[in-house]
Amino acid sequence: MITSFDLRDVPLVRQLDGQGIPMDTEAALTLGVHLLRNALVSYIAMGERGLPTFVLRKGANGDRICALAQLRHRTGAERARILYIAPRLAPDEAVSGVWLGLLDHLTRVSGARGAQSLVAEVPIDSPAVETLRTAGFAVYTRQEVLRLDLPAGAKPGGVVPEEGIDTGSTRLRPRRSEDMWSINLLYANTAPPLLQLAEPPPGSQDDAWRRGYVLEDKRRGDVLAYLQVKQGPVGLCLKAWLLPDAEDRAGELVAGALRLAQPVRPRPMYWLVSRYQGWLRGLLADNGFVEWASQAVMVKHTVARVGAEPARARAAALEHPKLAVPVVKAGRLPPHDPAHAANH
């Protein structure tokens, strides 16, 4: 039976802590895994803090199996993410069946909370990939995690001035509200359409831990790239989107990112690279990053999309993609002319 966490489940959560698999890479690498704290916060806030926890108890005596699953979802948001499932998969069918029950429950709960899709990130060689497929998830992309260990004497990046960091022919500066048109256009021109169903547009989820920066052409003022930096107690996580015809500026983007993202105290820095951004791996390796993990980003839709082809069929094509992304030049919106609009 699967139930929502309550105070009687505290011993079980403590018992399963460290025995499962994190499925939200950014959260795990920056904030760490805090099952009991998350469960208690969500319990006290009656689920409104977006970290609902569910426990499962099955069988009796020596055949008893206990498990838990944790979800991250802000009520009404389009996407939910699985934070953690425990215990890890084992060769016996009993644990696999427990996982399938939890995954089905998470899908139904996510849909009831307003989410249209449920996302999980798991190691590409993990048995979890096949179990998630059985539960109706599909691989939308592969993601490489690269790691850079900053030396103990690294100088903190500090606060980035509003005018930004000079990176040569470009500057890397904090995102402003007027940049959102260019950022959304950049995202539409770089992320494959199917993947856009799995991840929110950059800049739409800034919070106390996450900050956004744009790489701007100093001469023309065009937005060439967007950098997302999430800092937490245990690490930093970076992700970038760069216009296809601006790949020659990628070196300036990485150099600027390393200057602004250095933490006050030594913590590892991670860069998430989707498969369609493979050209970025070599550049990061030249700057000291090493391959740390290879993951499958898997998605299940909680509602049927009217008029859309099945997501599973489209996802299969993405595993061996031949991307031909149309490029629209990111520019400024034309000024609004009320007189001209009135004549039309």
Regions found by a protein language model. Give the residues of each.
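Active-site/acyl-donor-binding loops of N-acyltransferases
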Residues: 123-125, 135-159, 268-344
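Conserved acetyl-CoA binding element of GNAT-fold acetyltransferases
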Residues: 77-93, 232-247, 251
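Short, structured motif recognition centered on aromatic/hydrophobic residues
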Residues: 54, 80-83, 103-107, 118, ...
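Conserved acetyl-CoA-binding loop-helix of GNAT-fold acetyltransferases
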Residues: 92-108, 134, 247-261
